[in-house]
């Protein structure tokens, strides 16, 4: 299935400024993410950034990327990666049914299999009822369940998201043994696939109170009654780089996996 990967690459980060230029085994993180994207069947990769520095670094690597990769400067006042992608979609005038993969610039451990999984959801017979496709993986460590930097998701029996939160969801009462319940919690992996016509609807919605409280833009989708399908994949050790500590862990895992 034809799909285009767009990587929103904002330079500023309140918890880790300039993280997209942080070193991952000898290369800036944004370059590592692009390299991962190139292992997929995508027809095009667009880096959407508000940073001249990021743009120059990506352009410097053009010779090794081939003609699949482009980088575009965007406005700096976008409140989310989805808003930044919307600017690019309008600029390129993609067709309404074009599938877009929103790949975060701080996901250097992402795999082609994970990306293909969220795209393949749109081949399902029930895909007409799905607005957005994303991923999750079981959590097996208590410190991750209570970590507000790790977003949790609860799904129904059909794999549809009920809620996303930085808090521990579902809550476990004192009548349960945590060690016996490990694996019921799901860690959200922040990559998304959707069609351009969904993005047009999304941009017409205002921020919901839940989105403001949790600082999670995907809650705007649930608030407006649309469906997010969550593919649950086991044995994924994917880490978003949000802090210097997570950068250290990613460097260790990247060295092992490569």
UniProtKB/Swiss-Prot annotation:
It catalyses: 3-deoxy-alpha-D-manno-oct-2-ulosonate + CTP = CMP-3-deoxy-beta-D-manno-octulosonate + diphosphate. Pathway: Nucleotide-sugar biosynthesis; CMP-3-deoxy-D-manno-octulosonate biosynthesis; CMP-3-deoxy-D-manno-octulosonate from 3-deoxy-D-manno-octulosonate and CTP: step 1/1; Bacterial outer membrane biogenesis; lipopolysaccharide biosynthesis. One of its GO terms (molecular function) is 3-deoxy-manno-octulosonate cytidylyltransferase activity. Pfam families: CTP_transf_3. The keyword Transferase applies. Activates KDO (a required 8-carbon sugar) for incorporation into bacterial lipopolysaccharide in Gram-negative bacteria. This is 3-deoxy-manno-octulosonate cytidylyltransferase. It comes from Blochmanniella floridana. The lineage of its organism: Bacteria, Pseudomonadati, Pseudomonadota, Gammaproteobacteria, Enterobacterales.
């Amino acid at each position: 299935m034809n799909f285009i990967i767009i990587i929103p690459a904002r330079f500023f980060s309140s918890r880790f400024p300039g993280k997209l230029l942080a070193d991952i085994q000898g290369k800036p993180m944004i370059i590592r993410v692009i390299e991962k994207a190139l292992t997929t069947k995508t027809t095009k990769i667009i880096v959407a950034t508000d940073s001249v520095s990021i743009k120059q670094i990506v352009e410097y690597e053009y010779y090794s990327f081939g003609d699949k990769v482009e980088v575009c400067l965007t406005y700096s006042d976008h409140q989310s990666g989805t808003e930044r992608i919307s600017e690019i979609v309008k600029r390129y005038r993609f067709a309404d049914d074009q599938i877009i993969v929103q790949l975060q610039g701080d996901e250097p451990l992402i795999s082609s299999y994970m990306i293909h999984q969220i795209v393949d959801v749109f081949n399902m017979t029930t895909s007409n009822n799905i607005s957005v496709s994303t991923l999750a993986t079981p959590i097996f460590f208590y410190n991750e369940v209570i970590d507000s930097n790790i977003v949790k998701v609860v799904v129904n029996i059909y794999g549809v998201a009920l809620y996303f939160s930085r808090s521990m969801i579902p809550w476990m009462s004192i009548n349960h043994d945590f060690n016996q319940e490990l694996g019921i919690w799901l860690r959200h992996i922040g990559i998304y696939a959707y069609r351009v016509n969904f993005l047009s609807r999304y941009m017409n919605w205002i921020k919901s109170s839940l989105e403001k409280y949790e600082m999670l833009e995907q809650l705007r989708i649930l608030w407006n009654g649309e469906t997010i399908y969550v593919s649950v994949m086991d044995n994924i050790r994917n880490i978003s780089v949000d802090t210097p500590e997570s950068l250290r862990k990613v460097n260790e895992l990247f060295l092992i996996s490569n």
